[in-house]
Swiss-Prot record:
Zn(2+) 2 binds at C810, C883, C890, C893. Binds 1 Mg(2+) ion per subunit. Binds 2 Zn(2+) ions per subunit. The gene is rpoC. GO terms for molecular function: DNA binding; DNA-directed RNA polymerase activity; magnesium ion binding; zinc ion binding. Mg(2+) binds at D462, D464, D466. PANTHER family: DNA-DIRECTED RNA POLYMERASE (PTHR19376), DNA-DIRECTED RNA POLYMERASE SUBUNIT BETA (PTHR19376:SF54). Keywords: DNA-directed RNA polymerase, Magnesium, Metal-binding, Nucleotidyltransferase, Transcription, Transferase, Zinc. It comes from Beijerinckia indica subsp. indica (strain ATCC 9039 / DSM 1715 / NCIMB 8712). This is DNA-directed RNA polymerase subunit beta'. One of its GO terms (cellular component) is DNA-directed RNA polymerase complex. Pfam families: RNA_pol_Rpb1_1, RNA_pol_Rpb1_2, RNA_pol_Rpb1_3, RNA_pol_Rpb1_4, RNA_pol_Rpb1_5. Its cofactor is Mg(2+); Zn(2+).
Length: 1394
């Protein structure tokens, strides 16, 4: 019978409308209410008849018929008997589909514990009973008895007795004098008799009275779980099962294979074991078997049920016939292949195809070429309906035949169907939302999809065999969204940074660069032209070339915005390009009247987009693409080996550096420098040599050479490619023609012998071997990093998925302060770029008080110039970090939607966009590590240069002139300030301890002048007073070694770890400076001139030698320069987002005060800070010995200063300096990693993620709320509870914000469905069930999982409309109820969703 007809009889069931999903523990009654019958036999199907056995695991009587509307014995067939139950075989006549829905159950002969509540840490049963897991297992697995009621015996309540003790006690006190049980029955009894409210009261009292640190935490955990049971309506004894539910048979199928064998789901095996053991146990109990046998059987039953629920969680993994572990119910949910990630979040779609891509340069930006064969297949249903409508076919079958035969009318109809019906193209891996875009298909012959060249950057596609998938949006809404939101013409800007992503690359760039070249001495130089027609004529007549310097007329705009034509000094090529520019006041001809490199082209597109809008930009892009391709093809640029020019000075430079390296080797041999210092210096010298050669080569290649007749020779082709940004980088050119340079080992260290040859000369065998090292590392890294980066993206998406724009404005007064980021004197991120597209939090005024941007307005391009001109150094802007929206984020705090250049829309999923923007370059970069073939880039800063002209002021001027006459920085907080002529601070540079200052107070300084320099490879310890050296506790062999370098015979003193030896563990190695009278000198700030020496410091002076203030008395060697490469970067980003404590983290002062050194404690140094405030307790720090402590006794520190160097732990920054400082730190650190690779990401994306990491509060004082001290609660719950408490006249709770890493934050979201689908599924579900959690379906993931539209974008609007509709319905119903008595009143019109 036709399925359509069948469906007529089945009433259409409306999908159940629900607002939330709750999860709790199933009670035995609940399990029985689900069940359609008890399963008594382990049999599955009769292997001869293939019919299910009665009462077996596939029983048709319990689960329903195998064929639609047919009972098992065949007595009742067909629809007319629907609902009849056959008296012979007991099967209900209905659809076989019910075998996917109906459940059964197994009644257990003895209760068993649910393994999730027992073994999933923390053990819920253990917490409730306050017993250890070990004791619980001994009871449950029948090793010990537990006393339930001691009666009058001296036994204790809940005492554990082993078999012997139990029998002995029975003999001693009589059998009925006390009650002791064993197994799950015992635990069930205890759980059933628990008086939860009373226990909770007792615990609260105990917590209030407890004095120790740890006890309340432990008690609070137990109290929390008891309250969870009280509130959720779960009963503790339900954690022990008496009935086991059996899932429907079609979800654990048994399929006959050929050859009489069967393929079966593992669950059937697991269920069979449970049934077998249960039946055996029943028999043994009936037969009154000996206790020991029954007990053994009960233990085996417990193990069987454990394996069914979660195989391998306890004891051995149960394996099938082929030694493969069986997949239990828990495994069905867990992991990438589990139900959540494989089926609920990773559904497959139909109406899709995939094929190889080829370039389609003649396409428009909104088009893609779709092979006819593919289109015919994808649009079949549309073609059938159109054929039917036009009368070509009467039935679907006929239409099918027509399409199969590919009749000519089919192609005409295909054309009609496809017109204006967008398709979506996707290239895997889809790292950000631009990996799927919509295009209008254009039918082409062949089998490859044609892709527009300009969208390649967004897809990260190239044409070396990449494949792409095509998807057809079917419904009208889907087509509409594809056209309005996903069309390639709507995605011109990059969501990560707001720069154009539809940017010409490679050939197009080369063509445009070639067109806009200007050369001296070309024919026709200096001619004048009135219009383009004349120029074209002259070009055709070869009177001029594209590059001739001419005077030509072009349209532009004057100051008043009037269109005028002016004469420019330009070239014909530039005029041709200028013709393509849209006419607009803000886009004068000067935009194109220069040499076009990739960057210039990008700026040009940006200017066009910002001023002329999207449509003009798209047309313009298509035009310049055509021009670029045409001119590149005409130019015929290619290169040969002579284009790679090796500088003549190469042998000389190499010789000089080799001599330097030999000299360092000699110095090492003479014992003047250590091995590490020698290595650093040699590497440094070769690095400089490499740079010098590269510069010489670049100078040679880029130099313009003249012919004999004064005409410019054509520019070097390689230089053109690299300079224009079309292909190749200076690094690659350096390797081709200068020298390959330093290489890195796989461990990341730099090999000190560089590769002197370049690729043109060819490498020697040894050099080749060294270079394979780096290259291989690159390839290995690529594979590993792709996985790491993907995992980072997954965690980011998970933590940020519920950050959605929910309200237009939260009216927050707060914000964060932004200023330019200056690193080593270079402006890395200017103030303009950081505040553009953000909302001002306070009025920005010019010097005379006129408002540039009022508070609450967006800072646009027009304002930025004025802010700059007004000399404003710091701007307070609104940020998502300080947004006060209850759920999600408000539009004002977020600012501009970077991908559109307009204020962000309601419902935009900014969290996911942020996650993609941060994650996408991670993968890109990891895939990009090996492009420079492992050639080492040494990143080490050793000086500060001034960026401004001005006057020098030195803050906290602790300096001294040493023996060499250098000004040495003697303190940690010295800063060099450069003041402008009007006294404004232009820049502040913190100068590190031990640096040599090149300027002093009041000096005038020029741009590019050095302010200070230091040795990047060592950290010095300086003396602050003049005197002679004395050693303290520097004992040869115990705390110091004097190594005589075997190569040189020169002694070198070094501090060694003195704690390794018991005898010397109490030493405190130090150097003292003695004055003339032989006493230890006094420092100005009090305290003695005693300098503690950390492990591995190298002593640079002899005892008794005289020193001057500012001299280096010892130095600590820094680690050798590691190559910096995002390889180090990606783990760093992950470390920051996971908020891990770095290995050797900095110790930060928690208060401002004076430093005191205390008594040493074991092998730690004790430092305390005495705060300046009166009555404040000193704060103690224990610092492992051998760490270099920045401070000396008596120093004054500010809150937040470093005591011990290192990367600070983000938690410390949050605790000491607050949220704004923490955000600034995380943003800067993460940005630094990306900047190093030249990736630009807008700060707001990182802020969104940090906001998600700061959603929890640690309760300090619970006030009159239900919270427990030390508990972590959601910010939202915290605020709501406080409002409630204040309303009831109570005291609000206080708390401190907690920083959670992204994994932890994802697992602690309000939605348990989202958390379960992320990681640790079992743990999340166990906890949610105990708490009876309800998921209100607010985020994106949970809605995808339950199969709804996501509450973002158009889905948000739908959700809003649905809410409004429900409110109206309620009003109407309420009125109807009233109107049975009263007359109708008009319904008030509720505001619809915008």
């Amino acid at each position: 019978m036709n399925q359509e007809v069948m469906n007529l009889f089945n009433p259409v069931v409306q999908p159940q409308a629900f607002d939330q999903i709750q999860i709790s523990i199933a009670s035995p009654e609940k399990i029985l209410s689900w069940s359609y019958g008890e399963i008594k036999k382990p049999e599955t199907i009769n292997y001869r008849t293939f019919k299910p056995e009665r009462d077996g695991l596939f029983c048709a009587r319990i689960f329903g018929p195998i064929k639609d509307y047919e009972c098992l014995c065949g007595k009742y067939k067909r629809m007319k008997y629907k609902g009849v139950i056959c008296e012979k075989c007991g099967v209900e006549v209905t659809l076989s589909r019910v075998r996917r829905e109906r459940m059964g159950h197994i009644s257990l002969a003895a209760p068993v514990a649910h393994i999730w509540f027992l073994k999933s840490l923390p053990s819920r049963i253990g917490l409730l009973l306050d017993m250890t897991l070990k004791d619980l297992e001994r009871i449950l697995y029948f090793e010990s008895y537990i006393v339930l009621d001691p009666g009058l015996t001296p036994l204790k309540d809940r005492q554990l007795l082993n078999e012997e003790d139990y029998l002995k006690a029975q003999d001693e006190y009589g059998q009925d004098s006390f009650t002791a049980l064993i197994g799950a029955e015992a635990i069930r009894e205890i759980l059933r008799n628990m008086d939860l409210p009373k226990i909770a009261e007792d615990l609260k009292v105990e917590i209030a009275e407890s004095t120790t640190e740890l006890k309340p935490k432990k008690l609070a955990k137990r109290l929390k779980i008891i309250e969870a049971f009280m509130h959720s309506g779960n009963k503790p004894e339900w954690m022990i099962l008496t009935e086991v539910p059996v899932i429907p048979p079609d979800l654990r199928p048994l399929v006959p294979l050929d050859g009489g064998r069967f393929a079966t789901s593992d669950l059937n095996d697991l269920y069979r074991r449970v049934i077998n053991r249960n039946n055996r146990l029943k028999r043994l109990i009936e037969l009154r078997a000996p206790d020991i046998i029954v007990r053994n059987e009960k233990r085996m039953l417990q193990e069987a049920v454990d394996a069914l629920f979660d195989n391998g969680r306890r004891g051995r993994v149960i394996t099938g016939a082929n030694k493969r572990p069986l997949k239990s119910l828990a495994d069905m949910l867990k992991g990438k292949q589990g139900r959540f990630r494989q089926n609920l979040l990773g559904k497959r779609v139909d109406y899709s195809g995939r094929s190889v891509i080829v370039v389609g340069p003649e396409l428009k930006l909104h088009q893609c070429g779709l092979p006819k064969k593919m289109a015919l297949e994808l649009f079949k249903p549309f073609i059938y309906s159109r054929l039917d409508a036009k009368g070509f076919s009467a039935t679907v079958k006929q239409a099918k035949k027509l399409v199969e035969k590919e009749k000519p009318e089919v192609w005409d109809i295909l054309d009609e169907v496809i017109r204006e019906h967008p398709v979506m193209l996707n290239r895997a891996p889809t790292l950000h939302r631009l990996g799927i875009q919509a295009f209008e298909p254009k039918l082409i012959e062949g089998k490859a999809i044609q892709l527009h060249p300009l969208v390649c950057a967004a897809f990260n596609a190239d044409f070396d065999g990449d494949q792409m998938a095509v998807h057809v949006p079917l419904s009208l809404e889907a087509q509409l969204e594809a056209r309005v939101l996903m069309m390639s013409t709507n995605n011109i800007l990059h969501p990560a940074n707001g720069q154009p992503i539809i940017v010409p690359s490679q050939d197009i760039v080369l063509g445009l660069y070639y067109v806009t070249l200007m050369r001296d001495g070309e024919p026709g130089q200096g001619m004048m032209f009135a219009n383009m027609g004349e120029i074209e004529h002259a070009l055709n007549a070869k009177a001029i070339t594209l590059h001739t310097k001419i005077k030509g007329r072009a349209w532009t705009f004057d100051e008043n915005g009037e269109k005028v034509s002016k004469i420019f000094d330009t070239t014909p090529g530039r005029l041709i390009l200028g013709q393509l520019l849209p006419h607009h006041v803000k886009i004068p001809f000067d935009v194109v009247n220069k040499l076009m490199t990739k960057k210039e082209i990008s700026n040009m597109i940006d200017i066009v987009y910002r001023n002329c809008g999207q449509k003009e930009t798209v047309i313009f892009c298509d035009r310049i693409m055509a021009l670029g391709f045409r001119e590149a093809f005409k130019a015929g640029i290619s290169f040969g080996k002579d284009d790679m020019v090796v500088p003549e000075t190469k042998p000389r430079i190499i010789e000089e550096t080799s001599a330097l390296a030999k000299e360092y080797e000699q110095q090492y041999n003479d014992g003047l420098i250590t091995q590490v210092e020698k290595y650093n210096k040699v590497v440094d010298a070769w690095g400089k040599c490499s740079v010098k050669l590269a510069d010489e080569m670049m100078a040679r290649i880029s130099a313009v050479q003249k012919d004999d007749d004064g005409r410019d020779k054509p520019i070097n082709s390689i230089y053109m490619m690299s300079h224009s940004g079309a292909r190749g980088s200076p690094t690659q050119m350096k390797q081709l023609a200068a020298m390959r340079g330093l290489m890195a080992k796989p461990s990341g260290e730099i090999i000190e012998t560089p590769i002197i040859s370049n690729f043109k000369e060819g490498l020697t065998v040894l050099e080749y071997f060294n270079s394979t090292h780096g290259a291989r590392k690159g390839l290995a890294d690529t594979a590993l990093k792709t996985a790491n980066s993907g995992y980072l993206t997954r965690r980011l998406v998970d933590v940020a998925q519920d950050a959605i724009i929910t309200i237009p404005d939260c009216h927050s007064e707060n914000g964060i302060r932004m200023r330019a980021i200056i690193d080593a004197g270079q402006i890395v991120a200017s103030l303009e770029t950081r505040i553009l597209g953000r909302t001002a939090a306070e009025d920005l005024r010019e010097a005379d008080g006129t408002i540039i941007v009022p508070a609450g307005e967006m800072i646009e391009e027009i304002h930025v110039g004025r802010i700059n001109a007004a000399g404003i150094q710091e701007v307070k802007i609104r940020s998502v970090l300080t947004c006060e929206a209850k759920n999600g984020v408000c539009a004002k705090c977020y600012g501009r939607d970077l991908a559109r250049g307009t204020p962000v829309n309601m419902g935009e999923a900014v969290g996911v966009i942020a996650a993609q923007s941060i994650g996408e370059p991670g993968t890109q970069l990891t895939m990009r590590t090996f492009h420079i073939g492992g050639a080492a880039q040494i990143a080490d800063q050793s000086f500060i240069e001034s960026n401004f002209e001005g006057t020098v002021k030195i803050r906290n001027r602790h300096v001294a002139r040493n023996t060499d006459g250098d000004l040495m920085v003697m303190a940690r907080n010295v800063a060099v300030v450069i003041d402008g002529p009007d006294g404004t601070e232009l820049a502040v540079h913190r100068v590190q301890y031990g640096a040599r200052l090149k300027v002093d107070e009041g000096d005038k300084i020029k741009r590019g002048q050095r302010i200070a320099e230091w040795d990047p490879y060592t950290r010095p310890i300086l003396t602050e007073i003049d005197g002679t050296i004395g050693f303290e506790d520097l004992v040869e062999g115990a705390s110091m070694t004097e190594t005589i370098d075997e190569a040189t015979g020169i002694a070198k003193r070094m501090v060694i770890d003195w704690r390794l030896n018991q005898r010397s563990a109490s030493l405190k190695p130090a150097m003292v400076i003695k004055t003339a009278d032989g006493k230890v000198g006094k420092l100005q700030r009090g305290g003695e001139a005693r300098y503690m020496l950390p492990v591995d410091s190298i002593i640079g002076v002899d005892p008794g030698g005289s020193v001057k203030a500012g001299d280096v008395i010892a130095r600590i060697s820094m680690e050798s320069a590691k190559t910096r490469d995002i390889t180090g970067g990606l783990p760093r980003v992950a470390e920051l987002f996971e908020a891990r404590r770095p290995k050797d983290h900095a110790i930060i002062a928690e208060a401002s005060g004076t430093v005191q050194f205390g008594r040493d404690y074991k092998n730690k140094t004790r430092i305390s800070i005495v705060p300046h405030e009166d009555g404040a307790e000193p704060i103690e720090y224990l610092i492992p010995k051998g760490k270099h402590i920045y401070l000396q006794d008596g120093d004054v520190v500010e809150k937040g200063d470093y005591i011990v160097d290192g990367n600070p732990a983000p938690h410390d920054i949050l605790a000491i300096k607050g949220v704004e400082e923490l955000a600034a730190y995380l943003v800067n650190e993460i940005q630094e990693v990306y900047r190093l690779q030249g990736v630009s990401i807008n700060d707001k994306h990182i802020e969104v993620i940090v906001r998600q990491m700061l959603q929890k509060v640690d309760i300090v004082d619970s006030g009159d709320t239900d919270f427990l001290p030390g508990e972590q609660v959601d910010q939202l719950e915290f605020e709501e509870a406080n409002i409630q408490a204040v309303e009831n006249g109570g005291k609000p709770a206080t708390g401190t914000p907690v920083l959670l890493g992204i994994t932890k934050a994802s697992l602690q979201t309000r939605s348990f469905i989202s958390a379960a689908s992320f990681q640790e599924t079992t743990r999340v579900l166990t906890e949610a069930a105990v708490n009876g959690k309800a998921d209100t379906l607010e985020g994106l993931k949970e809605n995808v999982i339950v199969g709804r539209l996501i509450p973002a974008g158009t889905g948000a609007a739908m959700a809003k409309l649905r809410r409004v509709a429900v409110q109206r319905d309620e009003l109407i119903l309420a009125q109807k109820a009233e109107t049975s008595e009263a007359p109708l009143v008009p319904i008030p019109h509720l505001p619809a969703a915008e």
